[in-house]
Amino acid sequence: MPELPEVEVVRRGLQDYIVGKTITAVRVHHPRAVRRHVAGPTDLTNRLLGTRINGIDRRGKYLWFLLDTDIALVVHLGMSGQMLLGTVPRVDHVRISALFDDGTVLNFTDQRTLGGWLLADLMTVDGSVLPVPVAHLARDPFDPRFDVEAVVKVLRCKHSELKRQLLDQQTVSGIGNIYADEALWRAEVHGARIAATLTRRQLAAVLDAAADVMRDSLAKGGTSFDSLYVNVNGESGYFDRSLDAYGREGEGCRRCGAVMHREKFMNRSSFYCPRCQPRPRR
């Protein structure tokens, strides 16, 4: 699933190409892509026609178009969603198409059809204007108002595994499995450690590492293991070549040389160094 850096790459691409343009046509090719818009495909297309894109915003893994009608078009990429400008490699994966007044075509493709679009009202939460479906999400590490100390305070009260808390989008948004493993490796903390047992300094180090690794990923266009994540021009990111933990089972730790381990975690996998990140004793 695209995580914060990948969604931010898409947001920046859309910001450059479609802000200031007006939607002149919309076609929903697959109703499942608008299943979260409870009023249905016809309502969504009718309300989008003639609207101007005033901006593109994001929180965590969600992005949204700010429209001139004081509502937002919320986009969730799911596991395989892509926002592509121009031609697409697989027309059978196109779920929604939008045409703009200058002839630009935006296609939402989604092989697994787990993502989608919906229109939503805006509300103000803690000084930020957010679409209602996004309002429950915590600030992410790229947010100018992200407060490390405030998140540390929350984590110090959590009697569950730290990695589980990093993936909880109501604690801190935008971090997924890949960047959680990378942050924990950089901070030399095992994800199975109980959050409340860690010091403030250790927790802050993990959060700082998460922000740093995601900035590094953003600079390289994000992480692409397959064709499911690409930018708006269909190009893959290349941060996967720089991963220190995720996917490196059996390889040497880049810090100490120990063999990297993998273990099951919440129907996923966690990757870590057994020497740098010793597993807590039960």
From Swiss-Prot:
The keyword Cell cycle does not apply. One of its GO terms (molecular function) is class I DNA-(apurinic or apyrimidinic site) endonuclease activity. GO terms for biological process: base-excision repair. Its EC number is 3.2.2.23, 4.2.99.18. DNA binds at H93, R112, K158. Binds 1 zinc ion per subunit. SMART domains: Fapy_DNA_glyco, H2TH. Disulfide bonds: none annotated. The active site is at P2 (schiff-base intermediate with dna), E3 (proton donor), K61 (proton donor), R268 (proton donor). It catalyses: Hydrolysis of DNA containing ring-opened 7-methylguanine residues, releasing 2,6-diamino-4-hydroxy-5-(N-methyl)formamidopyrimidine; 2'-deoxyribonucleotide-(2'-deoxyribose 5'-phosphate)-2'-deoxyribonucleotide-DNA = a 3'-end 2'-deoxyribonucleotide-(2,3-dehydro-2,3-deoxyribose 5'-phosphate)-DNA + a 5'-end 5'-phospho-2'-deoxyribonucleoside-DNA + H(+). A zinc finger (FPG-type) spans 244-278. Its cofactor is Zn(2+). It comes from the Bacteria. Pfam families: Fapy_DNA_glyco, H2TH, zf-FPG_IleRS. Keywords: DNA damage, DNA repair, DNA-binding, Glycosidase, Hydrolase, Lyase, Metal-binding, Multifunctional enzyme, Zinc, Zinc-finger. Involved in base excision repair of DNA damaged by oxidation or by mutagenic agents. Acts as a DNA glycosylase that recognizes and removes damaged bases. Has a preference for oxidized purines, such as 7,8-dihydro-8-oxoguanine (8-oxoG). Has AP (apurinic/apyrimidinic) lyase activity and introduces nicks in the DNA strand. Cleaves the DNA backbone by beta-delta elimination to generate a single-strand break at the site of the removed base with both 3'- and 5'-phosphates. PANTHER family: FORMAMIDOPYRIMIDINE-DNA GLYCOSYLASE (PTHR22993:SF9). Belongs to the FPG family. HAMAP family: Fapy_DNA_glycosyl. Monomer. This is Formamidopyrimidine-DNA glycosylase. It comes from Mycobacterium leprae (strain TN). The gene is mutM.
